[in-house]
């Protein structure tokens, strides 16, 4: 805890390096995982570095605010190069999901008349393909190398809990999902706690994968590892952790 001269108390986090308090951000090494200063960004809303990949849905069903705005991987690289993160003392950049999302609009179960694009990245169709609206494999490798040259980590937000309903994986394996309906006939959507915590769907168009089953868990851990084996990511932020069973985490870290 820290206290002011007038007796006000608050908790404060002090980064340490070899037992010594770090007072300058540049003294924090990117290998000191417990001392990182993170910057979380949503790629589409961060910076547009390559207008050639801009692709709005331009649908009358979608408000402009929930359509694609043009942010991309090249935009992150540009901000690394111009010192944006360094000036803030950032040592780790956490980026939103980069995998391919749908090309059309989808509504929410609670209000199907309100439709959204997948600008956020949390509706994966392909788990090992960079969404072309965000960039290319080469642009991703360039961004990661640029961050590492600047002594910064990059962690990837990865979605293992669900796939978009249009995913070829789900079309080939429709039985890989949990049940949409509960025994009492209610839809198992948004049932976040209790017995349904590991089976509930976020919405009808993003079915939850039943990763309690080995034949489902194995390919989902393989696709997570794809990004660190084929690209130089420094780690993950896993989406919807509380809704994914323990066996997935054991398999991933085995």
Which residues fall in each region the model found?
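Short catalytic-loop micro-motif centered on adjacent basic/acidic residues
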Residues: 155, 235-241
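Extended acidic/polar, glycine-enriched regions
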Residues: 1-31
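Compositionally biased low-complexity segments at domain edges in trafficked proteins
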Residues: 25-53
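Substrate-binding/active-site clefts of carbohydrate-active enzymes
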Residues: 46-231, 249-254
């Amino acid at each position: 805890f820290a206290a002011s001269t007038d007796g006000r108390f608050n908790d404060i986090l002090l980064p340490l390096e070899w037992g010594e308090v770090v007072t300058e951000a540049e003294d924090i090494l990117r290998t000191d995982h417990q001392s990182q200063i993170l910057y979380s960004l949503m790629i589409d809303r961060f910076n547009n570095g390559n207008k050639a990949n801009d692709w709005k849905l331009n649908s009358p069903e979608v408000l402009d605010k929930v359509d694609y705005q043009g942010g991309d991987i090249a935009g992150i690289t540009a901000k690394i190069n111009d010192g944006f993160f360094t000036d803030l003392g950032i040592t780790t950049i956490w980026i939103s999901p980069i995998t391919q999302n749908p090309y059309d609009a989808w509504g929410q179960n609670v209000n199907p008349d309100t439709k959204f694009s997948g600008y956020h990245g949390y509706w994966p169709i392909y788990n090992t393909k960079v969404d072309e609206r965000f960039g290319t494999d080469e642009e991703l490798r360039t961004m990661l190398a640029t961050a590492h040259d600047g002594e910064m980590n990059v962690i990837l937000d990865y979605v293992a809990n669900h796939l978009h309903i249009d995913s070829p994986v789900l079309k080939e394996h429709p039985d890989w999902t949990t049940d949409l309906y509960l025994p009492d006939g209610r839809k198992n959507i948004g049932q976040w706690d209790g017995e349904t915590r590991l089976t509930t769907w976020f919405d009808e168009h993003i079915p939850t994968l039943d990763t309690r089953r080995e034949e489902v868990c194995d390919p989902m851990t393989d696709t997570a590892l794809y990004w660190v084996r084929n690209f130089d990511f420094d780690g993950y932020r896993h989406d919807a952790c509380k809704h994914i069973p323990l066996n997935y985490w054991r398999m991933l870290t085995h």
